[in-house]
Amino acid sequence: MNRVQFNHHHHHHPD
């Protein structure tokens, strides 16, 4: 799994 792929699939945003 590439870093770009991971970032694209998982978006981490603060609550």
Swiss-Prot record:
<keyword id="KW-0368">Histidine biosynthesis</keyword>
<keyword id="KW-0428">Leader peptide</keyword>
<dbReference type="GO" id="GO:0000105">
    <property type="term" value="P:L-histidine biosynthetic process"/>
</dbReference>
<dbReference type="Pfam" id="PF08047">
    <property type="entry name" value="His_leader"/>
</dbReference>
<comment type="similarity">
    <text>Belongs to the HisL family.</text>
</comment>
<protein>
    <recommendedName>
        <fullName>his operon leader peptide</fullName>
    </recommendedName>
</protein>
<dbReference type="InterPro" id="IPR012565">
    <property type="entry name" value="His_leader"/>
</dbReference>
<keyword id="KW-0028">Amino-acid biosynthesis</keyword>
<comment type="function">
    <text>This protein is involved in the attenuation mechanism for the control of the expression of the his operon structural genes.</text>
</comment>
